Amino acid sequence: MNIHLDKYGQGMPLVLFHGWGFDSQIWQPIIPYLKPKYQIILVDLPGFGLTPMMDWESFKKNLLDQLPDKFALAGWSMGGLYATRLAIEEPARVQYLINITSSPRFISDIDWPGVAEEVFVNFYNNLSKDINKTLKEFISLQLNKMKCDFKIGNPPSPEGLAFGLEILGTWDFREQLKQISIPTVYLFGRLDPITPVKTMAIMEKNYPNFKYVLFNRAAHMPFLSHTDLFITIMDEFIK
């Protein structure tokens, strides 16, 4: 099973993982800003876009077979969980890790800010009733009244949506994150309702070796709402 990739530009390989409900087309508005410096590699995650459903191990093997030996890796939201796991398990391949409004754990608990578990349970339960309505509600939550130009791309499969929600609800890399020694940056939006800005303060304390950037006026999509600042941060981070 092949992972669907799209490639643009030349230079340092930069692999981009999208978030839940979208496919790799979400990155299209920023490709013109990135491709003069990087070889952009857009990836459709399992069950999204043109990539079929598959488990983590199958995804990792197939993806690494198609990627350069070394690359920078950026993940947005759910894509940040995929990116973090790949960086933990394949440190010889991943040179830089960029997590965009992502977190090592998305569900809140007594000492960790995040989304209440019942929110994901409701999204999961509503998928079987009305996929389009559920997607629109999730997109509205991400935007938090911000205006962004984005492309939905190919409709996600029901299996991909369900698997993605399972990942958002169960993957937890807070302990394994301490293993990461490659250059790593976390980007947060102060108005983000999904990855709360409170997460940043906790992570700065627990993982002081990472870099942190706060977009004061951004919600969950800073790469689209504040593209110029996002590109500047990327260029300064990836040497």
UniProtKB/Swiss-Prot annotation:
This is Pimeloyl-[acyl-carrier protein] methyl ester esterase. The gene is bioH. It comes from Legionella pneumophila subsp. pneumophila (strain Philadelphia 1 / ATCC 33152 / DSM 7513). The active site is at residues 77, 192, 220. Keywords: Biotin biosynthesis, Cytoplasm, Hydrolase, Serine esterase. The physiological role of BioH is to remove the methyl group introduced by BioC when the pimeloyl moiety is complete. It allows to synthesize pimeloyl-ACP via the fatty acid synthetic pathway through the hydrolysis of the ester bonds of pimeloyl-ACP esters. The keyword Nuclease does not apply. The lineage of its organism: Bacteria, Pseudomonadati, Pseudomonadota, Gammaproteobacteria, Legionellales. Substrate binds at residues 20, 77-78, 138-142, 220. InterPro entries: AB_hydrolase_1, AB_hydrolase_fold, AB_hydrolase_sf, BioH. Its main location: cytoplasm. GO terms for biological process: biotin biosynthetic process.
